[in-house]
Amino acid sequence: MGFIDGKWAPMIVLIVSNMIAGMVNALVKKVLDGGINHMVIATYRLGISTLFLLPVAYFWERKTRPKLTLSISCQLFVSALFGASLMQYFYLLGLSYTSATLGSAFWAIMPSLTFVMALIFGFEKLSLKTKIGYGVVLGTLISLVGGLLLTMYQGIPLTNSPEQAANSNNHTGHENWIKGCFFLLTGVVLFSSWMLIQAKINVKYPCPYSSTVILSVFGTLQCALLSLIKTRHLEDWILRDELTIITVVIAGVVAQGMCTVGMSWCIKQQGPVVSSSFSPVVLMSATVFDFLILHREIYLGSVIGSVVVVIGLYIFLWSRSKQIVECKIMKLPTNTVEEEKEEEGRTNVNNGQLLVIPMTP
């Protein structure tokens, strides 16, 4: 009865969606270790998700979809550049140098990082005169410190892996770790930038699935062009390995397609803060699959950094939830249409209701 009346359904969807995201991270890492061009994976993934989401967007939004103008198309193209193609270029490149666990840990920094960028660009306002304001700042700082720990401190291995033992003290391996962390952080920064860009676009084109399809189309083309940076051989686009094919299909249909629909529904049902609070499930899932599937070592630095990031994330989310409630109580009506639009765009960022999820980690 609880599931039918919707009490537990969003929770189950959130847990399953985040578990799938962690599993896909581990599978993609396995495929990347095989030497495949990371942008080929991104291109196929976006292309497959486009085909999956196209009928969803057409039937669900055909009566509410506004006219797609040239201006909105150009803005969506730029949005896809930040949130899909360039983000995937750096994120997957970083994943190839590190691990699925580390990649998921960096993804958990994204809410705090987005908040900092929103402050810088004027999307967000913060008062340090209240305990809630201090909580937001504290959670943000703790998350960023956790990200710094993940980058700078690898630590000793906590597990024994014959495949990794030979390289555990390798200087080149440590350099790759630092390089990979830099690429992962760049990918997360790009995605945080996308959230601010997309918040403005959503005011003019408030159709989540249609926007996602358009972003995916642009992202597919952009990823295909970016793949030429690494190689221009046609045979690289032919997927022969069974695991690679399965990974690409799961990443496109399930992780990118079905999880996009599921996460969008959960945000509407439970709100963005509750939905974001389940993001550590991605980290736990990736760690389990990383160890069981890839047989990779788990390092002390990854564990400590991940714990710090999760603690900071929950402090941040708790403080933000209180701040959002406080803002709704104190909110005054705006006087002009321009002010209403500006406030709506700011609310999209503040509440996390960005409507579009172009690429899961």
From Swiss-Prot:
Protein name, entry field: WAT1-related protein At4g01450
Keyword ATP-binding: no
Membrane topology recorded in Swiss-Prot or TrEMBL: Multi-pass membrane protein
Family, similarity comment: Belongs to the drug/metabolite transporter (DMT) superfamily. Plant drug/metabolite exporter (P-DME) (TC 2.A.7.4) family.
Subcellular location: Membrane
GO cellular component: membrane
Molecular function terms from GO: transmembrane transporter activity
UniProt keywords, alphabetically: Membrane, Repeat, Transmembrane, Transmembrane helix
Keyword Acetylation (UniProt): no
Pfam families: EamA
Domain EamA: 21-142, 194-317
Organism annotation: Arabidopsis thaliana (Mouse-ear cress)
Residue stretches spanning the membrane: 8-28, 40-60, 76-96, 103-123, 132-152, 177-197, 209-229, 243-263, 273-293, 298-318
